[in-house]
C-alpha cells in the first residue's frame, strides 16, 4: 500500500504511441514505484452508494454469493437485527484484469442488534476494511430540558437515517476519556421528536426525549465543543467471524467494537497494510462506538509483512487503540475496554508488533506461537514505559527460541 501514486509530484504527462505515456516529475519519480507494479485510476472516490443496503431489516441471510465489483461501499448494514453471511466471496474475478472489489469496506455495520455471523467467506482487494462492525456515537449538542436532547451525527460521511427508536437504551460518555460519569446508567427513549431530515432538521440532527431525568452535566463543553456523546446500546450485536480469509487489503482486516460477545476464530490474514485486527471506540474522529466487554481472538493465523505502508505509524497484528478528544485515556481503575482474550493464534512476523494495546483490563495472551520471519525482528514485551527483555519478568514474561 502506498500513497506514492504515479502522479505524485508530476509536472507534465506526455502521450506516446502504443498506449504509453511518459510522466515528468519535479525531481525524481516516487520512490515506491518499481517495475511490475499495477496502479488503478478511479474517476470518483465518492462513496455514493452501497453494493447491498440492509436498513431496519431482520433475519437477513446471504449465502454462496460471489461479489466481483461494487462502485462505492460494499454490503452496508444500518439499524438491523440478525444478519448472516456464509460461503460468500468478495474478490475480483480471476483472470479478468480487474483488481478491485469495492472502493470502500466489504461488510460494514453501523448499528446492529441480535447477532452478526460471518463464516467461510473470502475477502480480497477491497479499498478499505473487509469487515467493520460498530455502533455510532451521536454528539450531545444541547440539553433542551430535563428529558430532551438535541443529538447530532458529526462525521461528514454519517447522517440521513434514524439512530433511535422508542424503547431503545442509551448511555452517555465523555469525549476526552470515553468514561461514563453516572456508572454507565442506561436511559430509555420515550419519544423520537424528530429524526434527521424531519421537522426542519438537517440530515444529521435529531431530537430525542427520554423517560428518565437527564444529568445536567450533559450540557458541559470541552475545548469549546460539546463534551458528551450518546451510544444506542440496544444496537450492539453479538459477533462471530469464523473460517474466513483476508488478502491484498490496503487497510485493516477486521474492525469490531461492540459490548456483546465477540468470537474471531480460525481465520487467515495475509499481509494487511495496516493493523490486521483494529479495536478502537472513537469519540472524536469517525465516532464509531463500542466499548469491548467480552472478545475472544483464537486459532487465527496472521502474516505480518512490510508491503510499503506509508500512512500508519503502527501496524501490529492486533491493535487496541481507542480514540478520544485530546488523545488521553482514563486511569487504570476505569479502562475503556475489558476482557479481551488472544489464545492459540499463530503469528508470522516480518515486521512490527504482535499486539499493541491501550486502556484494556483483563487482556490475556495465551498459548500463541510467534515466528520471526525476519532476523532483525526483536522479541520482547513493553509495559507502559518499561521494556521487558526475553526471559525477564515484572508482571509479564516472554520467552524466545530461535
Regions found by a protein language model. Give the residues of each.
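Extracellular polysaccharide-degrading/modifying enzymes targeting complex plant/algal/animal polysaccharides
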Residues: 1-68, 77, 93-100, 124-237
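Low-complexity, polar/charged sequence tracts that form flexible coils or short amphipathic helices
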Residues: 44-45, 53-59, 66-69, 76-79, ...
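Short, recurring structural edge motifs at helix starts
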Residues: 48-51, 105-108, 156-158, 227-231, ...
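Extended hydrophobic/aromatic segments used for targeting, binding, or gating
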Residues: 78, 82-122, 284, 288-294, ...
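Leucine-rich solenoid repeat scaffolds
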Residues: 357, 361-402
Amino acid at each position: 500500500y502506498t500513497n506514492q501514486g504515479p502522479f505524485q509530484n508530476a509536472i507534465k504527462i506526455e502521450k506516446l504511441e502504443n498506449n504509453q505515456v511518459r510522466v515528468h516529475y519535479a525531481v525524481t519519480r516516487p520512490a515506491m514505484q518499481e517495475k511490475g507494479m499495477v496502479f488503478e485510476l478511479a474517476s470518483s472516490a465518492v462513496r455514493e452508494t452501497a453494493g447491498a443496503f440492509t436498513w431496519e431489516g431482520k433475519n437477513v441471510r446471504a449465502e454462496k454469493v460471489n461479489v466481483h465489483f461494487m462502485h462505492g461501499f460494499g454490503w452496508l448494514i444500518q439499524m438491523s437485527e440478525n444478519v448472516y453471511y456464509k460461503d460468500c466471496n468478495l474478490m475480483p474475478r480471476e483472470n479478468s484484469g480487474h483488481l478491485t472489489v469495492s472502493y470502500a469496506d466489504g461488510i460494514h455495520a453501523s448499528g446492529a442488534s441480535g447477532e452478526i455471523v460471518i463464516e467461510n467467506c473470502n475477502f480480497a482487494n477491497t479499498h478499505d476494511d473487509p469487515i467493520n462492525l460498530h455502533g455510532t456515537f451521536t454528539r450531545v449538542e444541547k440539553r433542551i430540558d430535563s428529558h430532551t436532547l438535541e443529538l447530532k451525527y458529526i462525521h461528514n460521511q454519517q447522517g440521513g437515517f434514524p439512530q433511535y427508536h422508542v424503547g431503545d437504551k442509551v448511555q452517555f460518555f465523555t469525549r476526552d476519556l470515553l468514561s461514563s460519569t453516572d456508572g454507565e446508567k442506561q436511559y430509555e427513549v420515550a419519544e423520537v421528536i424528530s429524526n434527521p431530515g424531519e421537522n426542519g432538521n438537517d440530515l444529521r440532527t435529531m431530537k430525542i426525549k427520554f423517560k428518565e431525568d437527564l444529568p445536567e452535566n450533559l450540557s458541559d463543553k470541552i475545548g469549546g465543543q460539546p463534551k458528551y456523546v450518546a451510544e444506542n446500546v440496544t444496537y450492539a450485536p453479538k459477533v462471530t467471524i469464523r473460517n474466513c480469509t483476508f488478502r491484498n487489503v490496503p487497510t485493516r482486516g477486521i474492525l469490531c467494537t461492540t459490548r456483546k460477545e465477540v468470537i474471531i476464530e480460525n481465520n487467515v490474514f495475509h499481509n494487511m497494510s495496516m493493523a490486521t485486527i483494529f479495536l478502537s471506540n472513537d469519540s472524536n474522529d469517525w465516532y464509531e462506538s463500542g466499548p469491548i466487554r467480552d472478545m475472544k481472538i483464537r486459532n487465527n493465523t496472521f502474516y505480518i509483512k512490510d508491503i510499503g505502508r506509508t500512512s500508519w505509524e503502527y501496524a501490529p497484528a492486533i491493535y487496541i487503540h481507542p480514540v478520544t478528544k485530546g488523545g488521553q485515556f482514563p486511569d487504570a481503575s476505569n479502562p475503556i475496554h475489558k476482557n479481551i482474550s488472544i489464545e492459540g493464534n499463530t503469528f508470522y512476523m516480518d515486521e512490527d508488533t504482535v499486539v499493541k494495546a491501550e486502556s484494556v483490563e483483563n487482556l490475556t495472551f495465551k498459548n500463541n506461537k510467534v515466528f520471526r520471519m525476519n532476523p532483525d525482528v526483536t522479541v520482547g514485551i513493553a509495559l507502559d514505559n518499561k521494556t521487558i527483555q526475553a526471559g525477564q519478568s515484572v508482571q509479564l514474561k516472554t520467552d524466545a527460541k530461535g
